[in-house]
């Protein structure tokens, strides 16, 4: 049997193999359903930073402040001292989404950070808001960040396309690879089911304000953190994307169609990490759906299989603080887990 491949097909096959082998190494490490390895160390309620073990809710409140500070200092980087968001443009994309069962709006948000008293740094991104039309009163909402631009996440020709498009455009083998790697509902949510169950859906493409690329991402993080002088604890994109979730909620609290006390975050992989981060630092969120959040997310640094601190910080130097990278090969030294 004789096979013939064009140069384009050979290149596509090579890219597919690289994507898949990287995916196996980084995101498909198997997990034992009955693990017997040690738990988190130090224990969340045990002695920590010279403090005795937690014995009541009041002591837990004090402990949680210490833990959040430690995660900023050693893993994710430091959050802004002050920040906020405002809607600078809003338009109705369609009032007949899903055969008239929902309406779709596009909001442009301007968000800002301040790491000192003198500097204010801004960025903008678009938010899609799909709300059911035949439901009385404010509705609960699922808020998600995705790998694909908004026009790929909710398919409607009226949705704005970001400059440069995105990795989810096109047809053929690479589009198939994207779907295979990320799954049906990672990039394109089950919108009809969400709306039919009485939920609203809001989605954003976080690469609009912090690109998921090493050089471009680090440059954006630097611009947004002007006023922060310690490069070792400058925030990474996981913290910035998580912060972005909170800025969306700043806007949603004034949205009459949304019950801002019932907003649930959703994210896969890196955006699962961001969703967990956001919920840990912002108590306004009602819940989190973090799918395969892995290292730097729900997985422990110590006693784990698959992706290590060294693996993830070398492959994605923009995701975490530079301080986290210093724990490569010595995960037991990370003060929190």
Sequence positions of predicted segments:
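Bacterial N-terminal signal peptides
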Residues: 11-22
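N-terminal targeting or regulatory segments adjacent to alpha/beta-hydrolase or S9 domains
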Residues: 23-125, 134, 155-159
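Short beta-strand-to-loop junctions in surface cap/lid or active-site-entrance loops
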Residues: 126-137, 146-147
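Cap/lid segment of the alpha/beta-hydrolase catalytic domain
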Residues: 138, 143-254, 297, 301-303
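Short beta-strand immediately N-terminal to the catalytic nucleophile in serine-hydrolase-like folds
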Residues: 143, 265-267, 291
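Alpha/beta-hydrolase fold nucleophile elbow
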Residues: 258-269
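Glycine-rich nucleophile elbow surrounding the catalytic serine of serine-hydrolase chemistry
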Residues: 267-279
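Mobile cap/lid helix-loop segments that gate and shape the active-site cleft of serine hydrolases
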Residues: 290-337
